[in-house]
Amino acid sequence: VVPVTFKNGNSSTTGYLAVDTGAAQTMVSKRIARDLRLLSMGSQKRVGIGGVVNVDVGLVEAIRVGRAEIKNMQVSIHDRIMELGYEGLLGFDFLGRFQMSVDSDKQVLVLTPRK
């Protein structure tokens, strides 16, 4: 679980997301979407370990983990992950843009831009 900062217009918020390399798209809770005043761009079906769910989709201006940042990224909006105590999933759409490593001693996720 990592702290993730989101920015959208004049709004920003931080949530604790589970790192999920198996998730194709980053998913955020409805609380995060509400704090960011995200507008739904429609709904789509997503298939995950818990089955098929309908999710709203929104566009976030910036998503940041530490110094790693991606601009204008589409996210799924759904509260199902909240049942596990997370505010979302940090998916491969974000993680795949970086080389990832885990520093076990410091208990940190290290994200380095791909060359």
Which residue stretches match the model-derived regions?
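Pepsin/retropepsin-fold aspartyl endopeptidases
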Residues: V1-K115
